[in-house]
């Protein structure tokens, strides 16, 4: 069966004329301006100019059918790049583009502000918007799909029709619930109705609404304030818009804390209150962990299913979540976005920064009972204690060498495989260990962080400083 592909931009606007009133339905299929990135690739696949050229090519611009098909194929290849991207990546882009097209325009703008990079990011942004809207008032999920109609020519109404329109303009709440809205934009009257173009009032369906030249009723209707739900304190006459604000206020009378978390006493109270106001209603049946959003539960369940759709283009490693891939890519790029405000040291992960900051916060360290060595984290102490227990449960299948840590075994495997995943962005030289890359980058940056306390001479590596001190300051060190 042949399928006819019709560009949305070629559809003529729908014109309806009745007694001097012309209604034009706005074209919903607007071009999505923000390009999207495929997982594991830093180059944007959905480049808007290429997509736009492909969508807007006209048959009249070519000499015939053969050239038209050839041109379409060429533009499609330039846009989707099938020689460098998988079928799943191309499918992801097309699904994303169509999904963003069918979104209401106001949601398109809100999503575009967050620059999402995947389908999961779009879902999370939209669910966050739904939760934010839910705090001010629940929306009716069965509300009919709206379409915007532009009233360009208006004829005066007479007699009973004029009174009926005036009566409907004064009724605010029923029309709002049924999906009708009237406003003025750029000097033109805009009427938003349900999908059939009819205005519902007092439970009755009337004929398509015709505008009149008396704007006073419309202005009086728009001037009515929107009803707000207020929460009143039983002890005092104070009123609150948010229910959580009332609960927090009530704690001042009872003396009971809003929650036992220390965050309630910190500067991040606003964000923490949002967490308290949202129940974790989505629970994983495998491990019992609960989540606030269904998208977070779906993302978590990939761990149990073993699904790993996100692959690194540099080394081929796969991940179950996009966040894991982005964090892994920092190994190849050398990016360390988390900065310690106390000493200026940078870290690749936020958990590494938190662990490091315990040194500055003077928290009680974890001490090894065997040798007295202290650690800022209990996990590091556990790893250290394997030295004393001589437990080396991780064995190399190639040479039989055993290691106490999995990370040591992974690093050792690179000797057999010849893998060098850490590449310099400046000269493209690759290294087996991240520490070797860090030392190499100092050559390009002319960085010498190790300084002699005696003479002030600086070195790129700690070993160079030790050699210098042994040779020039041997007497003072002794």
UniProtKB/Swiss-Prot annotation:
Annotated InterPro entries: SCAN_dom, SCAN_sf, Znf_C2H2_sf, Znf_C2H2_type
Record-linked Pfam families: SCAN, zf-C2H2
Cell compartment(s), UniProt: Nucleus
Cross-link (Glycyl lysine isopeptide (Lys-Gly) (interchain with G-Cter in SUMO2)): 17
Region Disordered: start-end pairs: 159-181, 200-226
SUPFAM superfamilies: beta-beta-alpha zinc fingers, Retrovirus capsid dimerization domain-like
Keyword terms, alphabetized: Isopeptide bond, Metal-binding, Nucleus, Repeat, Transcription, Transcription regulation, Ubl conjugation, Zinc, Zinc-finger
GO CC annotation: cytosol; nucleoplasm; nucleus
Any one GO BP annotation for this protein: regulation of DNA-templated transcription
Gene Ontology molecular function: DNA-binding transcription factor activity; DNA-binding transcription factor activity, RNA polymerase II-specific; RNA polymerase II cis-regulatory region sequence-specific DNA binding; zinc ion binding
Location of the SCAN box domain: 51-133
Membrane-spanning parts: none
Induction: By serum stimulation.
Gene3D superfamilies cross-referenced by the UniProt entry: Classic Zinc Finger, DNA breaking-rejoining enzymes
Bias (Basic and acidic residues) ranges: 164-181, 207-226
Zn-finger (C2H2-type) residues: 231-253, 282-304, 310-332, 338-360, 366-388, 394-416, 422-444, 450-472
Function recorded in the entry: May be involved in transcriptional regulation.
Protein's UniProt name: Zinc finger and SCAN domain-containing protein 26
Gene field: ZSCAN26
């Amino acid at each position: 069966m042949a399928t006819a592909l019709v560009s949305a931009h070629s559809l003529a606007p729908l014109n309806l004329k009745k007694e001097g009133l012309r209604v034009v339905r706005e074209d919903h299929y607007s071009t999505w301006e923000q390009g999207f990135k495929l997982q594991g690739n830093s180059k944007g696949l959905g480049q808007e100019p290429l997509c736009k050229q492909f969508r807007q090519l006209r048959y009249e611009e070519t000499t015939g059918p053969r050239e038209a098909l050839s041109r379409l194929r060429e533009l499609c290849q330039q846009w989707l790049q099938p020689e460098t991207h998988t079928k799943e990546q191309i499918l992801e882009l097309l699904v994303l583009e169509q999904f963003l097209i069918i979104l209401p325009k106001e949601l398109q703008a809100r999503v575009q502000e967050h620059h999402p990079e995947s389908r999961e990011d779009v879902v999370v942004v939209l669910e966050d918007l739904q939760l934010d809207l839910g705090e001010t008032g629940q929306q009716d999920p069965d509300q009919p799909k709206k379409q915007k109609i532009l009233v360009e020519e208006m004829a005066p109404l007479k007699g009973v029709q004029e009174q009926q329109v005036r009566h409907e303009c004064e009724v605010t709440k029923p029309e709002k619930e049924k999906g009708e809205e009237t406003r003025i934009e750029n000097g033109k009257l805009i009427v938003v109705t349900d999908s059939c173009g009819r205005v519902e009032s007092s439970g009755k369906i009337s004929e398509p609404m015709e505008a009149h030249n008396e704007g006073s009723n419309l202005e009086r209707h728009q001037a009515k304030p929107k009803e707000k739900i207020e929460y009143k304190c039983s002890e005092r006459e104070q009123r609150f818009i948010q229910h959580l604000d009332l609960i927090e206020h009530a704690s001042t009378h009872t003396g009971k804390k809003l929650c036992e978390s220390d965050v309630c006493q910190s500067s991040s109270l606003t964000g923490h209150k949002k967490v308290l106001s949202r129940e974790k209603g989505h629970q994983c049946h495998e491990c019992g962990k609960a989540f606030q959003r269904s998208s977070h539960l779906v993302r978590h369940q990939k761990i149990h299913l073993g699904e790993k759709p996100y692959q690194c283009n540099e080394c081929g490693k796969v991940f179950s979540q996009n966040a894991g891939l982005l964090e892994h890519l920092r190994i190849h790029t050398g990016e360390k976005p988390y900065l310690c405000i106390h000493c200026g040291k940078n870290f690749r992960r936020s958990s590494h920064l938190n662990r490091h900051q315990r040194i500055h916060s003077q928290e009680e360290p974890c001490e090894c009972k065997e040798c007295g060595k202290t650690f800022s984290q209990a996990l590091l102490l556990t790893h250290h204690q394997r030295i004393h227990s001589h437990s080396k449960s991780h064995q190399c299948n190639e040479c039989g060498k055993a290691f106490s840590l999995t990370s040591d075994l992974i690093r050792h495997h690179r000797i057999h495989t010849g893998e060098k995943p850490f590449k310099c962005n400046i000269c493209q030289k690759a290294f087996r260990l991240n520490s070797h890359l860090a030392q190499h980058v100092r050559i390009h940056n002319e960085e010498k962080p190790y300084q002699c306390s005696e003479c002030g001479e600086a070195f790129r590596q700690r070993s160079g400083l030790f050699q210098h001190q042994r040779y020039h300051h041997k007497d003072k060190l002794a």
